[in-house]
Amino acid sequence: MLSAIIATNESERSLVPTLAALVPGATAGLLGEVIVADAGSRDATAEVADVAGCRFMSSEAPLGTRLKAAAASTRSPWLMFLRAGCVLEPGGIEAANRFMEATDRLEGATRAAVFRPPGAADLLRPGLSELIALLRVALGGGAKPDQGLLIAKRFYDALGGHPEGADAEMAILRKIGRKRIAMLASGARIAR
């Protein structure tokens, strides 16, 4: 079972496609809950989360503190962190499930995963941003927060969760380390 945690800040429009991409996972019983960790938005972010059946947590605390609090409140053994506007490709939840099952078989495994950057499956016609993302991955530039993060809750807790301070999402990826981050076969893109 998986809990999705979505970081938001004035995200009423970008939250909708992110949530829509998670519906297949919820209907298949793989996604148990969605938590929206909001920075105190004054737009309709809370209403969008409510209509979608998400748990809404609002705090003006730094991003790392909000994400860590949301993770602590989950009931699932696996966490998936996404930014508002991050849209999983069809099959994304199934790819996440395969990774979770494989990792769970290796008891005590300390691995995490990110979704493939846009364009990684289509090397013949990538746009400039997709090409840059592919080069970054190929040259060891590592994962970026726009790719989401899939991690076992016990591993997340052992790492101390997201740190406080600037760029908490990138900091947790660095803390995990490139060698312990797998890239899923399914991708994620930022909705425009």
Q: Model segments located where?
A:
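A conserved acidic beta->alpha catalytic loop
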Residues: D38-A46
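Short aromatic/hydrophobic "clamp" motif used to bind/position activated sugar donors
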Residues: L79
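A recurrent flexible, glycine/aromatic-enriched loop bordering the glycosyltransferase active site
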Residues: R111-L123, A133-I151, D157-A158
